[in-house]
Amino acid sequence: MRLIAFLVFATLSVMPLHAATSEFGTKDEAVAMVKRAQEMFKKDGADATFKAISDPANKDFHDRDLYVYVYTLAGVCVAHGARPALIGKNLIDIKDQDGNYLIRAHVEVAKGPGSGWVNYKWPNPLTNKIEDKTSYVEKMGDDYFVGVGVYKQ
């Protein structure tokens, strides 16, 4: 009887933790999503990849609060998993709440080391608050960068 009570308690005490963490993506999942986009880009080319990324039904590039975006190194959005209305817009001068140039920072990572993390503040659609976010960025081909952001928990 004690064993059953212990197992029930252990199961119930872990469930809320799992539910709380499963609603947000992780850094490892963000990196994996960028790698999937890179693989598709190399295999299928830019047009097919950008179309797949911008399709909200495509679960390879959309998972909970994670989504892929791709910009040219000049700052023009060419694919966006959360806001397709941004496609075609030059956002090189967009700033976060603290006045940091968001897309410029992504471009610097892509042109410099070729991959890395960019930190900024951004609206979280799940909480409707401005929150700390970090995005994993990689240069994609010669002309683009690809990224996926994670809200810091």
Q: Model-derived features: where do they sit?
A:
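N-terminal membrane-sensor/transducer module of prokaryotic signaling receptors
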Residues: R2-Q153
